[in-house]
Each structure stands twice: as structure tokens, then as C-alpha cells.
Amino acid sequence: MTTLVLLRHGESNWNRENLFTGWVDVDLSEKGLKEATRGGELLAEAGVLPDVVHTSLLTRAIRTAWLALDAAGRTWVPVRRSWRLNERHYGGLQGLNKAETLEKFGEEQFQLWRRSYDTPPPEIGPEQVSGVDERYADLAPDLIPRTECLADVVARMLPYWYDAIVPDLRAGRTVLVAAHGNSLRALVKHLDHISDTDIAGLNIPTGIPLRYELDDDLGVLSSGYLDPDAAASAAAAVAAQGKK
């Protein structure tokens, strides 16, 4: 048996302002800093001590990993970063207010863009592509998205799962993945075999560790949040985003 922990980054400044964030590199809010620290405290209290961390190239996830490791007394463990764990690219919606977008385009279109499995938002223009960011300098231009649906996130995340995370799990390491709402939804979809339709109803709260116990074939034996009551309340708040 091996342990995998998924941790969505703490609240970001754009989460607080109800904006679509995607690949924009926004840092944690004051609340988010506390959430990330509390996530690490929950790990320590549960005796779930990471041996290795995988995170994205975005500051809010990296800082969450740092704060959680510090609170858990595990600052020395290796931290591996990959663009494949980045948040879903929200295309032309990035930077827009969710409530205003809902009002402008209507409930049906808003939910299609936000929660459907295979409907991406409008693309950004070539002048906005994240390739101008030096963190993606070694990434082939055709891999840098202009928009993504969740299916696209699954497609780019799974190679990293198999090539980087699975070997750590098979070596018996306790693995922490500190990432984003949609990159973690993509991973949960894979782990729990959630259908393309049902995944629309999955919401992952910020800063609360989700623990999986996996068998030798990496099948799920059990899973659950380390603070179930807080997770249920926070997930409901995520589902309600878009409302003023």
C-alpha cells in the first residue's frame, strides 16, 4: 500500500476577486497563505509525511507546497515542478470576472466553459501566448495552449503521472501533489474512473489535503479529505463561484 496526497493551492488573489486565473501567475492571498500552512499542519497531525512533492510552474502552487512542507516539518524533501501540472488554460476568459461573465453569456454557456469536459473557452490571441514567459522557454511552441478544456488537461497531465509520479509511488514513497483545481480534477477523474459527464460535479477546495491509499497496482483502496467538514463546505463555495 502507498499514499498519495492531493493538495489544491490556497486561495489566490484572483480567487478572492472571483476572476478566471488559468496560466496567469497569481500569488496567494493572505487567506491562501494560512490555508496552505493549515494544509501542512493537517498532514503532520495525520502522520502523512511526504517523501517527495510534485507541483506546477505557477507560484501559487509552489508557495503552497513550501508552506505545507514547512508546517509538516518536511522542508528538505525534493520538490519537482512541471508545466503539465499547471492549472487549466482558460483562454480568453483569463482575467475576467466570473459573475460578470455569467451575466454576459448566460448560465448554460458559462457552465459549458467552466465545467464541461470537452468544451474549451475562446482562444487567446498569439500575442498573449505564455511562451513569452521564461519558465516555458524549453517548451515546444505547439505545446503551449491558447485555451483548454478539461479533456486537454487530462491529456497533458497523464504523461507526467505515468513518467514521474507513478515511479515514486511504486518506490513506496508518500507523494504530495500540490497543484490546481483542474489539474487535480483531471487526476481524480483518472484515479476514481469518473465519467466525462459526472466530472462536471466535482469541486476541489483550496488548502485541504485529499489522501488516497493505493494498492500495489495503484488502484484506490480508500480516499478522503483530512478535514471532511471543512472540505464539504469549501467545495460548495467553489461550486457557487460565478455568483455575485
Swiss-Prot record:
PROSITE patterns hit by this protein: PG_MUTASE
Name this polypeptide is given: 2,3-bisphosphoglycerate-dependent phosphoglycerate mutase
Residues reported to bind substrate: 8-15, 21-22, 60, 87-90, 98, 114-115, 181-182
Disulfide-bond pairs as recorded: none
UniProt pathway annotation: Carbohydrate degradation; glycolysis; pyruvate from D-glyceraldehyde 3-phosphate: step 3/5
GO biological process per UniProt: gluconeogenesis; glycolytic process
Protein purpose: Catalyzes the interconversion of 2-phosphoglycerate and 3-phosphoglycerate.
Gene Ontology molecular function terms on file: phosphoglycerate mutase activity
Enzyme class of the recorded protein, top EC level: isomerase
